[in-house]
Amino acid sequence: ATEDMRRRFAKIFGEEDAKRLEFRTINGISQKVLQYFAYRTQKTPFQVADKEASTAVKQSFLEVTGKYATENDIKETQLEITYAKNMRLTPEEIRNMDTEVEKFPEIFRTYNAKLRQMQMIDYDDQMIYALRILEQYPGVLAYFREKYQYFCVDEAQDTSKIQHDMMDLLAAKSRNLFMVGDEDQSIYGF
């Protein structure tokens, strides 16, 4: 996605201008925030679970329901986990979610506990932790506001609440936020 955006920009404005800019996904910015915070606090950066996250979903599903998850169960559970995290749902809101996933609140808790046991985070957690750091550490927020003064979000209709909150926070000082999207294609409803 970022390389495609860079190529499109270079085609219109030229390669020299494209080289002076950074093109990142919101997850890419989140990763930079976590790396910078780890460097500043001299802590080990978080490990992001990839295949481990899928394994944790399967194990959590089996542990909570007593059933082996089908491919559809895994897909649906992962989608619900992503939705809950990206919409910044509270535990009560998760308990009250309208979902087809049997015992989802318990699976959600078990899944997150398994990630903690492995000392890992998933890609959704990466955004959650990055936003918390930006909200709670003014020096880190100031650094990223200085580093990134202009924001263009493509496919803005697909941004989640947490992604929207992060962009709002980063661009709050400069007010240089440009979002492009098609509301008829929105996957979130806020």
What would you call each of these model-derived segments?
Residues 26-29, 77-83, 129-130, 147, ...:
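Short acidic/histidine-centered micro-motifs embedded in hydrophobic/aromatic stretches
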Residues 49-53, 99-190:
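Conserved helicase NTPase motor core
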Residues 1-43, 142, 161, 185-187:
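P-loop NTPase Walker
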Residues 2, 30, 34, 85-89, ...:
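Short alpha-helix boundary/capping elements
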Residues 18-20, 39-124, 148:
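ATP-hydrolysis module of ASCE/P-loop NTPase motor domains
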